Amino acid sequence: MSGTAEESDKAEAVSVPETVSGSVESQDKEHNSTSSSSDSTDVVGGKKRTIDEVDGSSENNSASVDQLKDAPTDSKPKTEATEDSPIRGNQGNNQENSQENKDDEDDEDDNDDDDNDDDDDEDEDVESYRKKQRRERNRFLDIEAEVSEDEDDEEDEEDSELVREGFITRGDEEDEEDRGGRVDDRLHRELDQNLQKTADEDMHKIAEDFKKRYGRDSSKDYRVQTQGGYVPQRFMLPSVDTAIIWSVRCRPGKEKELVRKLLNKKFNLDKSMGSKKLKILSIFQRDNYTGRIYIEAPKQSVIEKFVNGVPDVYSNQKLLIPVQELPLLLKPTKSDEVRLDVGSYVRIKRGIYKNDLAVIDQISQNNLEALLKIVPRLDYGKNDEIDPDTNQRKAKRATFASRPPPQLFNPTMALRLDQANLFKRDDRHFTYRKEDYVDGYLFKSFKIQYLDTKNIQPTVEELSRFGSKEGDVDLAAIAQTMKKAQASKAMFQPGDRVEVLTGEQRGSRGVVTRSSKDVISVKLSGFSDKSLEFPIASLRKIFELGDHVTVIAGEHEGNAGLVLLVQNGQVTFVSDQTRENLTISANNLSKSMDSTPTSSEYALHDIVELSAKNVACVIQAGHDIFKIIDDSGKVATVTKGSILAKINVARAKVAAVDGNGREIKIGDVVREKIGSRREGQVLYVQNQHIFIRSKTITENAGVFVVNPMNVEAVASKENLMSSALDLSKINPNIASKMGPPQTTQQTRLVGRDVALNKTVRIRSAGYKGQLGIVKDVNGDKATIELHSKNKHITIDKRKLTYFSHEGGEGITYDELVSRRGRTPHTRLGPSYVSAPRHMAAGGAVATNTPQQLPGGMTPGWNAFDGGKTPAVGQNGGTSSWGGASTWGGQGPGGASAWGGAAGNTSTWGGQGATSTWGGASTWGNKSSYGGASSWAASGESGAASAWGGGNKSSYGGTSTWGGNQGGVSAWGGSGNKSQRSKNTGGSSTWGNNQSQHNSGERSAWGNASQHNNSGNRSAWGNQDARGGGSTWGGNN
C-alpha cells in the first residue's frame, strides 16, 4: 500500500480518496506472498488487480480525476455505486483496464486457489462499506486511504472535530459554498478592474488639467530653451493669460484658519455640484501680509459667491493684484514657524496665564488648537464677592495684575474654601469651576494663535514645577547647561576685572582691554604689558565686597545693589529696589556708580494713582512690573501701563484727624494706639486710610496702611516749627522799635475741623439751597445732615456756605478758617451797627481795666464813649474807632481821621486827651517819639515819654532802661530817680494812679488826663507831628 501511495503522488499528486481497500495488508499477511509488486493484489469491486494495473490506470484516469474534482457531487449517488464502493466510476474503469491486460492471465490462474478466501474477504468489506456513512470531504487536506479497521472510530472522531473547526465541509454544502466563492471572486475582480480604470482616467484628467494651466508645449521658444536644461526667468513670470489673484480682507490672526475653512468648502461644493466645478484655483495666505487672504479665480463674481457667508471674511473689500506684483507676492520666504509636537514647550500670550510656561499635551486634527498642561493659578475663592441681596458667592474674574502665584492644584484647599465648585472624578482627576485638573496640573485648550512657540527658554524654576513630581527632569544638568549658555553670552566691557578659569594662566587676574564676540583681550597683572586673548567661556568677572553692581542680563535685569558676598562665581547683593538679597552669576553683573533706588519712572515708596479713587504706594520697583500696596492694604503686582500718574506729595494738601482729634498731615510721625503699636512717618493720606513708613519693619518695604482713628500723633512738623525759639524777640535793635505789648493771641485750634457742627447751606447741584449741619469732616469731604429730611450726604466742604446758629450773613470755608471758626453773629438792628442797642451810641464808659465785649464787636478798651460805628442820623460825624469822624467831621483838616471832632480828641479814647488804652493818648501828647508817655499818667504837659525824655527826642532824653537827667525813668519814679526806686513823685509805667509807697505816681495804664493843656493833644490829631497838630488832618 505504501508503494501505491508513492506512485500516486508521482501521478500529478492527485488524491483519489478510498480507491484502495484496507484489506490489502491482510491478504499479504495470509498468503505470505513475495515482496515483489507483481505478487501484490488489489481488490476493487470483488476483482483482483495488480499494482501494475493500478499504475497504468492511474495515468489514464488523471483527466477523469480532475473532472471529478471540478464537477459538483450529488448528495445521493447511484445504488450500484453505493453497494459496491463509494466511487463506482473509478472501479468500472479499473475492471476494463484489467480485462484488456492479457499478460497477467497466468498469474490469475496461479492464484485460483485463493479465490474463495478473497470472496469471503470481499463480502466482509462490502458489509463494512454499507455500514459506514458517507464521510465528509476535506477541501484543504489530502487524506489517504486507511487499511486498518481498528482506527475507523478514531477517524470519525477526528473528522467530526475538523468539521467543527471549519477545516472540512460537508459534501451537501460544498456545491453552494463553491458556487458562492466563485461569484465573490468574480465580483472582487470586477471591482478592482473598475477602480483601476477610474484611477487611470482621473490621473489622465488631472494631467491634462495641469497641462492646460501650466503647460508650455505650444511655445517653440520654451521647448528650445528647455532642451539645454535651462529655463529663463521670463518664461516663469505670470502674464495676463494666467489666472487672476484677488486679495480679500479678513480678521487679522484668522488667515490660516480661513484658508483651511475655505479649502474644505471648495471640496464640498465640488462634490455637490458634480461635473460642474467651482472655478477656484487656489487659496493661500502670506505671513508678512496680515489681515489678507489670496484667492486665485478668473472672475470676481466667483469669489463673491464663494466667500459669501463665511465669518471673519470681508467680501466687500477685495483688491485685484497687478501682474507686476505677482512675483513678489509668490516669492518664497523662509518661514519662522516652529513645528509643534506633543511635549513641546510654549508660552501663553494672553489672559491670567500670560507669559506662563506650558507643555503641549494634544494637538487638534486641524492644527488650530492645542491642549496644554499648565501650572494653575488659583485663589480658591478668597477674593470672591458676595451678593448682599442673594447672599451668593460671585466669582471675581482674575486679571493679570491681581493673579495668584503658580501652584499645583490643592484639592484640600478647594474643599475647605469652595466646596460647591469641586467635583472628584477619581483620585487623580478633579473638576474645579468647570476646568479639569489631573495630578495637580490644569489641562486647558488654547488656540495656536494665542501661543508663543518661538525662542522658548524655560527657567530652572519653571522646569522644576513640571518635572519635580515625576522626577523626569534633571535639574542639576539643566542648571549646568544654562550656566554654560549664560557664560557663552556673557558681556565683558573694557575695564572689567576678570579671572582666568582654564589654561596655563588659570587663577590669574587682570583687566579687560578689548572685547569682541568670542575673544576677550585681557591685560594680566604681573605679566608683560602685552594683552593676552582668551575665549569668553574661560573668564569670570571679579567683584569685591561693597561694590555697587547692576544686573545686565537675566531675570533680574536692571536691579542694582551693594555686594554682600562673593562665592564660587556667585555674587549676593542687596537690591536697592526691593531691599532683598539676590544671588546672581558674576558674569551677568556690571560695576556701577549709581546707587539710586529708582527704576523707570517710579521709585521705591512713590505714591501712584491707579484710578480716580484709588492710590497705592510702590514697595518694589522694576522696569515694567511694580509691586504695590493699595489704600485697602492689599499687595498686588501691576504693570507700568496700569499706573496713571505719580502723585506729587510735596504739593498735596491732604490731612486727617487721629483718634485724639488732632490733625495729621504728610510727614507727621504717628503711632498705633492698638495692636503692635507700630510707629512711622506718614507718607500720604487717602480718605479713611493713611500710608505709613516704618524703619523697623522689613515687610512690604516698611509700608503699612491703617485707619487714622487708630493712630495718635507723636510729632507734627507744624508743632515743632511753632515751638521753636524765636530769637528775634530778644534782639535789642528790633526791640527798641517794637510797639506796645499786645494781648495774648488765641491758641490755634489743632485737630478739630472748624467746619464741624456748623450750619451750612449747600451750593452744589443736587441739593443746592438746602440747609443742614456738618456732622463729620474727613479731608475735603463733609457729611451733612439735612434739615429738610433725615438724610446724610457727603459733599465737598468748600462748596458750602457757613452760618452762625442765629443765621445772618454766610461765609465761605476759607473765610471760616481765617476767622478761626467764628461765624458772624446776627444783630437785632441794622447790619452796620457794631454794638447791641442797649449800648448808647455816644455814651462814654471809662474803665481802667479792659473788658471783654460780647460778640465779635470791634471797639477795644473803654471804647463805648464815641467808639461805635456811625449810627443813623449822625451824618458820619462820629468816628467808627473813636471821636469825630474824618469822613463826617466839622471842617476840613480839623477833625482827626481816627480822633474826635476837635484836633485834640484822641483816636482811641473818648474826648480830647483820653487815652485809647486808658491813660494819656498814645499818639496824643506832642511828638510821637517825645510827647506824653503812652503808658504814663495823663494831665501833664509833655509828660515823661516812655522811650525818651520829657521834651526831647526819643533817641535822647530819658533812657528807656535807666534814669538820666532830663526826664522821668520809664521803669522808675520821676525826678531822675532809678526805675526801681520807690521815691515820691516818680510816675511808674506799670503803676496805678496812686501807689502805695509813692504819692502822686501816675500809671501809664491809669486814668484819663486831668489837664487839657495843649501839650497832650493826640499825635494823630494835633497840628504838627512833633508839636500838637494832628498828622492826619489837624488844625492849621
Swiss-Prot record:
Gene3D superfamilies: 2.30.30.30, NusG, N-terminal domain
InterPro entries: KOW, KOW_Spt5_1, KOW_Spt5_2, KOW_Spt5_3, KOW_Spt5_4, KOW_Spt5_5, NGN-domain, NGN-like_dom
Compositionally biased residues, Acidic residues: 102-126, 143-160
Compositionally biased spans, kind Basic and acidic residues: 67-81, 179-189
Biased composition (Polar residues): 976-998, 1006-1021
Bias (Low complexity): 33-44, 89-98
Region (Disordered): 1-189, 383-403, 892-919, 966-1036
Keywords: mRNA processing, Nucleus, Transcription
An annotated Gene Ontology molecular function: mRNA binding
A GO-annotated cellular component: DSIF complex
Gene Ontology BP, a term: mRNA processing
Predominant place of localization: nucleus
Subcellular location: Nucleus
Biased composition (Gly residues): 892-902, 966-975, 1026-1036
Alphabetical list of Pfam families matching this protein: CTD, KOW1_SPT5, KOW2_Spt5, KOW4_SPT5, KOW5_SPT5, KOWx_SPT5, Spt5-NGN, Spt5_N
Entry keyword annotation includes Nucleus: yes
SUPFAM superfamilies: Translation proteins SH3-like domain (SSF50104)
Family to which this protein belongs: Belongs to the SPT5 family.
Subunit structure: Component of the SPT4-SPT5 complex. Interacts with RNA polymerase II.
Biological function: The SPT4-SPT5 complex mediates both activation and inhibition of transcription elongation, and plays a role in pre-mRNA processing. This complex seems to be important for the stability of the RNA polymerase II elongation machinery on the chromatin template but not for the inherent ability of this machinery to translocate down the gene.
Record-given protein name: Transcription elongation factor SPT5
Gene label: SPT5
